[in-house]
Amino acid sequence: MTGDGQGPGDGQGPGNLTTSISWAGLPVLVVGIGVSGLAAARALLARGARVRVVDAGDSPRHQGAAATLRALGAEVNLGGLPAGPGDSALVVTSPGVPPTAPLITGAAGAGIPVWGEVELAWRWRGGSRWLAVTGTNGKTTTTEMLGAMLAAGGRRSTTAGNIGTPIVDAVAAEPPYETLAVELSSFQLHYTHTMAPLAAAVLNVAPDHLDWHGGAAAYAAAKAGIWRRPGTTAIGNADDATSADLLAAAPGRRVLFGLDPAARPRPGLTVVDGHLVDDAFGGGRLVAVRDLVLTSPHMISNALAAAALARAEGVGPAAIGAALVAFRPGAHRNAEVAVIDGVRWVDDSKATNPHAAAASLAGYPSVVWIAGGLNKGLAFDDLVRDARRVLRAAVLIGRCADEIAAALARHAPDVPVERADGMDDAVKAAAAFATTGDTVLLAPAAASMDMFRDYAARGDLFAAAVRAREG
């Protein structure tokens, strides 16, 4: 994993770049012209850096972003990546670029620092406090919950990072934010070297993105990088073995959250007598579970993690409770689309891996499951084995439909299975299986790009097909 020793400011790289660097005229190569790359390039240009941007893509979207940056003074080259960094003193890479890319290995071999947009933002953060969230699943929901708690507590705050808003934009806001709720992926953490948030949570760790990281150990290490500094309060999940194991090595204060108050060591935030309880920060009872809209185990777990982060920042128990009572999840995350003839239709298109789909399925007693898409090299056996008791039927789409069907045949042979060519057909097939009291759940357990632009487009098409049935 790219760690402390490879970040400028740690004594590495030409010019020993530090937080007090003069950016004027500094040659910086920005790799990728997506959301974070575009934001990083703009921020660097605003500070007077000499910016060159490269991207392997050359679509109309790329061309539009390139035109914007050229107008601001950047050099932009599309349609391929160079073999090396040229005369750049710093490389700022988009998170999707793997560390094995020749451009990245070439820069590292030449002693040129490689940062991500998060590293830039941390060095430009001013006086803002950061509360950071990572994990295989639940990051966005937890970050949204945390943002709601901060707002309820009267903080001038916002959410940023993998949730949508680039962090370099958030730290540049005027007037400045007091606190940022930051969602970070393993990709982003790999290219982040000096960040030391006030508190950080690792929600869970399950196999994902293993091809990018090169294995499960490197993936877990990237997640653990979120709390590598001793000044960070590290928050781990007692119900997730890997998160709890990683927490044991954190150098700062350690806090556990979890659903079982009898677990050992006992979680500092847990559920007791139907209430979310904070013993770690002295908050006592925070809220009754019965007062929450979403009470599935993984949603309660997310709420405990968000509460731990908010309490670490000093948000009061009453504000946390009020925020959770009012909280509604964003689109495509266990979002109820409609109830038609006693059948509930739920969009969890954000469940893009088996671990996320398992958490979603565990929240419903009788499910017609719509699943499938582009597999990330993961197995579906554990998912099907754990979910078989709630499955009434499965409707499969996408490239990995056969893989899921094979897992169903092995572990849930009595569950009816039907394949569908697209979302309209999938909704039609699911409606034929579903009866009063069932939930039709889109929890694909796979990525979307084989059939759809992204998970949001997949969820939107599901919702449109469902609403068309309402007449």
Swiss-Prot record:
| Involved pathway(s) | Cell wall biogenesis; peptidoglycan biosynthesis
Please give one Gene Ontology molecular function term for this protein.
Answer: ATP binding
GO annotation, biological process: cell division; cell wall organization; peptidoglycan biosynthetic process; regulation of cell shape
- Which residue positions does the secretion signal occupy? none
Disulphide-bonded residues: none
- What UniProt keywords apply to this chain's record, in alphabetical order? ATP-binding, Cell cycle, Cell division, Cell shape, Cell wall biogenesis/degradation, Cytoplasm, Ligase, Nucleotide-binding, Peptidoglycan synthesis
Entry-linked HAMAP family: MurD (MF_00639)
Q: Which PANTHER family match?
A: UDP-N-ACETYLMURAMOYLALANINE--D-GLUTAMATE LIGASE
Protein name, UniProt field? UDP-N-acetylmuramoylalanine--D-glutamate ligase
